[in-house]
């Protein structure tokens, strides 16, 4: 049985769907879900194959987006963190009428480094794929440690992420592998030039996975979008800076 796990909280007049990153699940939002559900009708989702959304194998980005969309409200602000940012972006591209605003958090339209494009070296992503088959729990933990490195609260932030992972059964190796394949191969830089809904991009200055150098490059490529950098955050600004993060979303709600 392959059902998407979906939880709805709050009764705000605007729907907000939160999509988590690679290796994780919707429990990662527990640090902000109370605050956000007082302003929005909040939707917490486990991506296909992750957390409680069992019974899925490795999916393409397009299939992942379609699977999530099946249970979604007619119209919502879609927020995606990291890998989830690609899923939210894909939904904005294929079903713009369902997307009131697009928010990407510590996400890149092209995670993999390319010619004159900063990102994760492809051999690093390939290395993670290789290590998954050897010791996938340790590989996921290494990936999580990378996400909080450099912040003042790095240790406790990493603990919060690890707790999220361990709270639920680990995803299957092929699901994790499929997620890494998306990070390694997808490039939405050009397609996202054409989205017309409000588009907010949030970054961490200390992020080791999405280099801050991409921010001005995307400002130029997508002049209709807005960007904001959390000065002391790494890859998970909603964990290190929850109050500031929520304020940004409440401010966006006033504008849509």
From Swiss-Prot:
Keywords: Biotin biosynthesis, Cytoplasm, Hydrolase, Serine esterase. Its EC number is 3.1.1.85. Substrate binds at residues 22, 82-83, 143-147, 235. One of its GO terms (cellular component) is cytoplasm. Monomer. Pfam families: Abhydrolase_1 (PF00561). It catalyses: 6-carboxyhexanoyl-[ACP] methyl ester + H2O = 6-carboxyhexanoyl-[ACP] + methanol + H(+). Its main location: cytoplasm. One of its GO terms (molecular function) is pimelyl-[acyl-carrier protein] methyl ester esterase activity. It comes from the Bacteria. GO terms for biological process: biotin biosynthetic process. HAMAP family: Carboxylester. The keyword Protease does not apply. The physiological role of BioH is to remove the methyl group introduced by BioC when the pimeloyl moiety is complete. It allows to synthesize pimeloyl-ACP via the fatty acid synthetic pathway through the hydrolysis of the ester bonds of pimeloyl-ACP esters. Belongs to the AB hydrolase superfamily. Carboxylesterase BioH family. It is an enzyme of class 3 (hydrolase). Signal peptide: none annotated. It is found in: Cytoplasm. This is Pimeloyl-[acyl-carrier protein] methyl ester esterase. Pathway: Cofactor biosynthesis; biotin biosynthesis. The active site is at 82 (nucleophile), 207, 235. Residues 15-242 form the AB hydrolase-1 domain. InterPro entries: AB_hydrolase_1, AB_hydrolase_fold, BioH, Carboxylesterase_BioH.
């Amino acid at each position: 049985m392959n059902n998407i796990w979906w939880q709805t909280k709050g009764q705000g007049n605007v729907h907000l769907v939160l999509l988590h990153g690679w290796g994780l699940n919707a429990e990662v939002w527990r640090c902000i879900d109370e605050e956000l559900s007082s302003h929005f009708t909040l939707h917490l989702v486990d991506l296909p194959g992750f957390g409680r959304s069992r019974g899925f194998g490795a999916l393409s980005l397009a299939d992942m987006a379609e699977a999530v969309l099946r249970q979604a409200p007619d119209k919502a602000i879609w927020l995606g963190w990291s890998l989830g940012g690609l899923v939210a972006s894909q939904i904005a591209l294929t079903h713009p009428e369902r997307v009131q605003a697009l928010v990407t958090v510590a996400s890149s339209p092209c995670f993999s480094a390319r010619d004159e494009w900063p990102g994760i070296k492809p051999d690093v992503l390939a290395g993670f794929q290789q290590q998954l088959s050897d010791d996938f729990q340790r590989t996921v933990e290494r990936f999580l440690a990378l996400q909080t490195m450099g912040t003042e609260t790095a240790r406790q932030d990493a603990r919060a992420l690890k707790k999220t992972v361990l709270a639920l059964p680990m995803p299957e190796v092929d699901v994790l592998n499929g997620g890494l394949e998306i990070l390694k191969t997808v490039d939405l830089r050009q397609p996202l030039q054409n989205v017309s809904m409000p588009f907010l991009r949030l970054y961490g200055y200390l992020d080791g996975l999405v280099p801050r150098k991409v921010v001005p490059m995307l400002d130029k490529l997508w002049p209709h979008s807005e960007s904001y950098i959390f000065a002391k955050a790494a890859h998970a600004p909603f964990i290190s800076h929850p109050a500031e993060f929520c304020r940004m979303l409440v401010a966006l709600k006033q504008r849509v």
